[in-house]
Amino acid sequence: MLDSKLLRTELDETAAKLARRGFKLDVETIRKLEEQRKSIQVEVENLQSTRNSISKQIGQKMAAGDKEGAEEIKKQIGTLGSDLDAKKVELEQVMAQLDEFTLSVPNIPADEVPDGKDENDNVEISRWGEPKTYDFDLKDHVDLGEMGGGLDFASAVKITGARFIVMKGQFARLHRAIAQFMLDLHTEEHGYTEMYVPYLVNSDSLFGTGQLPKFGKDLFHTEPLAEKVNDEEPRKLSLIPTAEVPVTNLVRDTITDEADLPIKMTAHTPCFRSEAGSYGRDTRGLIRMHQFDKVELVQITKPEDSMTALEELTGHAEKVLQLLELPYRKVVLCTGDMGFGARKTYDLEVWVPAQETYREISSCSNMWDFQARRMQARFRRKGEKKPELVHTLNGSGLAVGRTMVAILENNQEADGRIAIPAVLQKYMGGATHIG
């Protein structure tokens, strides 16, 4: 969430910055609530001051033998106490309304982020690799997978429903190999610590990284049992939409020593998304699934280091594509296309031959102190007493299913076989082709 001080002391400036991303801040309502807060706060402080002043008179009355006077003052204090409690409740109610406003407000975009409305206004930064030309009719990854017997969408529909997949044989092994290669690269060369985390999280975790309260409809939620099981209280949990949630929340409610920053973590997990609002989009194939695997990259940094860390983290995701020899382009998202909690985001888009276009395969974001404030994730500088908020960053390094799509389609050969990228062959038992 944003620093509430911005809404109190820089309201108009903050509203103008948020307008860049198409968000209309209800300035008048916030201003009225802030005026109420100030007024009630003054009343609370005056009542506290009066009560404290009168309380001192009790001792004086008792010392003078004026018990009746002392009792009268006690009655006054009781009345003041009741009035004070009532005003505190009023103050809490106004503060709750202000907090509710704050929770619905997205992050402020960085100054250098291009203005725009949607993905059409994103700005291309660079390209790597040249799309291949083929002298035979291209097949998409669905046809390639079904022809090889490795992608079974029909069985997935029978077992669960649409937007799920069953993989078999060499296709399942390729999927595993991609994730293993990514983890090895990030841990052995890029300095990340591999994490194994829960796939179910509580609402506090989802609040911390910004999925709640705004994006609950995008999640899969469990229904708590009506009674205890193994002495555990019933609780509602949610399947993770990304490993960003459990991994970033590892620093929730902690104070890290400056010397221990940056913290760099990676995790391979399944991700679960309802894909609310995507009806009719990418209904064929592996591009948009309810369940998909992803290798996530997370960095926790000092404030002054986070923009440099964003470039580094994005470069780590790019390295995966380069080693797999997959053509891609890098774009910076415009203000209108960025995620709710992001201050700046790069997308990496891989070439998908059958669609003759680039498709997103990684999104790398600097969340600034937006998540840290929600999580109370802080660090303490050497020699300082007061802790500061960390900055958090995350990115896909990469989405495994979409990487598989790119490999299948870019590496297909005229006879229907798929050439396995050189860096993956050791994970595939030395095989050079599928099929």
Swiss-Prot record:
Principal subcellular localisation of the protein: cytoplasm
* Pfam families assigned: Seryl_tRNA_N (PF02403), tRNA-synt_2b (PF00587)
Which keywords appear in this protein's UniProt record, sorted alphabetically? Aminoacyl-tRNA synthetase, ATP-binding, Cytoplasm, Ligase, Nucleotide-binding, Protein biosynthesis
A molecular function (GO) held by this record is:
serine-tRNA ligase activity
Q: Which reaction does it catalyse?
A: tRNA(Ser) + L-serine + ATP = L-seryl-tRNA(Ser) + AMP + diphosphate + H(+); tRNA(Sec) + L-serine + ATP = L-seryl-tRNA(Sec) + AMP + diphosphate + H(+)
The UniProt record gives the binding positions of L-serine as 242-244, 296, 396
In what pathway does it function?
A: Aminoacyl-tRNA biosynthesis; selenocysteinyl-tRNA(Sec) biosynthesis; L-seryl-tRNA(Sec) from L-serine and tRNA(Sec): step 1/1
| Keyword Glycoprotein in record | no
Which GO cellular component does the record give, naming just one?
A: cytoplasm
Which Gene3D superfamilies does its entry note?
Bira Bifunctional Protein, Domain 2, Serine-tRNA synthetase, tRNA binding domain
Q: List the InterPro entries hit by this protein, alphabetically.
A: aa-tRNA-synt_IIb (IPR002314), aa-tRNA-synth_II (IPR006195), aa-tRNA-synth_II/BPL/LPL (IPR045864), Ser-tRNA-ligase_type_1 (IPR002317), Ser-tRNA-synth_1_N (IPR015866), SerRS_1_N_sf (IPR042103), SerRS_core (IPR033729), tRNA-bd_arm (IPR010978)
Residues bound to ATP: 273-275, 360-363
Q: List the disulfide bonds.
A: none
List, in alphabetical order, the GO biological process terms annotated in this UniProt record.
selenocysteine biosynthetic process; seryl-tRNA aminoacylation
Where is this gene product found?
A: Cytoplasm
Record-linked PROSITE patterns = AA_TRNA_LIGASE_II (PS50862)
Write the Enzyme Commission number(s) for this entry. 6.1.1.11
Keyword field contains Cytoplasm: yes
**Which family, according to UniProt?**
Belongs to the class-II aminoacyl-tRNA synthetase family. Type-1 seryl-tRNA synthetase subfamily.
Q: Subunit details for this protein?
A: Homodimer. The tRNA molecule binds across the dimer.
NCBIfam families per record:
serS (TIGR00414)
**Role summary:** Catalyzes the attachment of serine to tRNA(Ser). Is also able to aminoacylate tRNA(Sec) with serine, to form the misacylated tRNA L-seryl-tRNA(Sec), which will be further converted into selenocysteinyl-tRNA(Sec).
Q: What is known of its domains?
A: Consists of two distinct domains, a catalytic core and a N-terminal extension that is involved in tRNA binding.
Q: What is this protein called?
A: Serine--tRNA ligase
Organism of origin is Vibrio parahaemolyticus serotype O3:K6 (strain RIMD 2210633)
